[in-house]
């Protein structure tokens, strides 16, 4: 392409397959990443060659609206951020499986704790994995507030069950998997914080002054949006890109749809969590 004096290259954003091509070409050409939704052809016989010809024609006529592709350092942050989201989902699945094993053993502690990720629940699980099954020993691991609220007899009864060697092994394995997932999550967050403190210290500090946003949310927002707001014309454009703005789909004075777009799923989750946290804060929001 350099031999033929090509200066601009456009490509479809197909899953992750565009990323290695983008990395190879970015030092040499002006690149455009096109959303396939906006460059669809009229239905006809389809092939890769015809698609390439169509994208080239759209590029020459300046019809390609390039997608937002963040700088390399932000892309690295995104990998850590999205890994944390994946690990959180994995932890939830493992906790559900762990509780299912305990329910199978007639251990009903989850009926009395706030959630299966609480310290008391984890302490009991660790004891089971070590072969400790006596209710009078397990009840000592329960937080006093839980015992005072429900009564020691009810808590002790919830810890009486029939636990086989196989189930102890399953509990031990699931606990090890949970510990590994938690350790990986901490490593990812530590790396994100290290990069943000080195590359974007001022932005990281300012974000945490907003009610509802702490360290984890601040690093996630930087990873998903970046720090160059010139990429978005207005705040409405950013809201739309995040998938938080209703679509404008109206024809002949009839509203067809007002549902939000898919947007950036990870960013939307973070912003919604921050909004819920801010709604519960005592700080005044201006």
Spans of model-derived segments:
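A detector of single, family-specific signature residues
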Residues: 1-286
């Amino acid at each position: 392409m350099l031999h033929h004096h090509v200066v601009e290259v456009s490509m479809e954003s197909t899953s992750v397959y565009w990323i290695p091509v983008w990395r190879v070409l970015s030092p040499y050409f002006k690149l455009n990443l096109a959303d396939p939704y906006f460059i669809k052809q009229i239905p006809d016989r389809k092939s890769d060659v015809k698609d390439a010809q169509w994208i080239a024609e759209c590029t020459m006529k300046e019809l390609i609206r390039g997608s937002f592709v963040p700088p390399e350092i932000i892309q690295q942050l995104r990998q850590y951020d999205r890994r944390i989201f994946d690990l959180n989902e994995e932890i939830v699945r493992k906790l559900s499986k762990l509780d299912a094993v305990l329910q199978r053993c007639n251990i009903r502690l989850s009926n009395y704790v706030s959630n299966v990720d609480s310290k008391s629940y984890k302490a009991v699980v660790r004891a089971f994995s070590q072969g400790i099954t006596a209710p009078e020993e397990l009840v000592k691991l329960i937080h006093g507030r839980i015992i005072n609220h429900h009564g020691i007899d009810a808590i002790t009864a919830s810890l009486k069950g029939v636990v086989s060697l196989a189930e102890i092994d399953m509990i031990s394995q699931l606990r090890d998997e949970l510990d590994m997932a938690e350790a990986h999550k901490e490593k990812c967050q530590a790396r994100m914080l290290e990069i943000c403190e080195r590359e974007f210290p001022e932005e990281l500090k300012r974000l945490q002054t907003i009610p509802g946003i702490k360290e984890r949310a601040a690093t996630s927002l930087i990873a998903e949006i970046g720090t160059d707001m010139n990429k978005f014309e207005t705040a409405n454009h950013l809201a739309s890109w995040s998938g938080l703005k209703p679509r404008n789909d109206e024809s002949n004075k009839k509203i067809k749809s007002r549902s939000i777009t898919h947007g950036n799923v990870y960013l939307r989750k973070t912003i919604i969590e921050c909004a819920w946290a801010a709604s519960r804060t005592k700080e005044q929001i201006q």
